[in-house]
Structures are given as C-alpha cells and as structure tokens.
C-alpha cells in the first residue's frame, strides 16, 4: 500500500449509483480526490470533471454527490456533517450548483459501512432507494 492509500480519515472507496441502468460500482477515493479535503470539495470536483455546463436540475446529466468529511465517525467534535452537492432548482435567480449540509449519524454510518462518498447519476423510471449494509448494496423498490 503506497502512502496515498494510507490517509487517515478515509476508507479509500466510494459508490457510484447509476439510476438509469440500476448498476452500482465501487470507485477508489485516491488518487482522483487526493487534493480534495472533505465532502464539499469532493462534490465540487465531481461536478467540475463530469457535469456539462448549462446542465439543469432535472437533466439526466445532473448528479447528486453525498460525502462526509474525513473526521466523520472519529468522535471529533462537530465532525458529523454530510455534504450533499447537486444543481439545486430552488436557488434564486437561476438553478446553480450548491452544497447542503446535514448533521446526525449519516456521516458516521457511511464511513462505518466503508465508503467516502456516493455519486448518484441518471434517472430511474420508478421510485427506488439505495440500501447499504457494509459490502451489500442495492437499489430497492420504494413503492413498498
């Protein structure tokens, strides 16, 4: 394992969820995100690299990036934050990229499951939700 893989606070992998195909794949955190610290920076890097200019909130090219910071799950004070980066339709006067932040235990749970980020892309034909239990992950029907 080289030095870049030994970064503390990172699990070394994330998930990419394609709602169009239903495919979920693991992706390495490094070396791609070696210069980004925290969920917001990681989210903006994904948008810079992958989302075309002038993408609208409901376009299939838009993505949702869910990413906690490196201290999440460590017990450090104020570290249980998760960043959700996307092109939001509610930003005035026009839709634009932004990050919302949530607290609670989602950040720690995502790290405990072994993931630094989730990139959601595409569009599903029906309502689905992402089920994650450590190395088991799948899209499930949300209609019940």
PLM segments and residue spans:
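Acidic carboxylate diad motif detector
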Residues: 1-144
């Amino acid at each position: 394992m080289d030095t870049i893989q030994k970064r503390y606070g990172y699990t070394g992998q994330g998930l990419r969820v394609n709602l169009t195909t239903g495919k979920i794949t693991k992706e390495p955190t490094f070396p791609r995100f070696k210069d980004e610290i925290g969920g917001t920076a990681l989210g903006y890097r994904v948008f810079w690299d992958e989302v075309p200019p002038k993408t609208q909130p409901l376009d299939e090219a838009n993505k949702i990036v869910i990413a906690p910071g490196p201290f999440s799950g460590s017990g450090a004070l104020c570290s249980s934050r998760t960043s959700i980066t996307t092109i939001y339709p509610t930003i005035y006067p026009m839709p634009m990229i932004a990050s919302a932040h949530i607290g609670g235990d989602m950040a720690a749970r995502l790290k405990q499951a072994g993931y630094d980020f989730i990139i959601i892309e595409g569009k599903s034909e029906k309502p689905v939700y992402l089920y994650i239990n450590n190395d088991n992950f799948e899209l499930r029907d949300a209609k019940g």
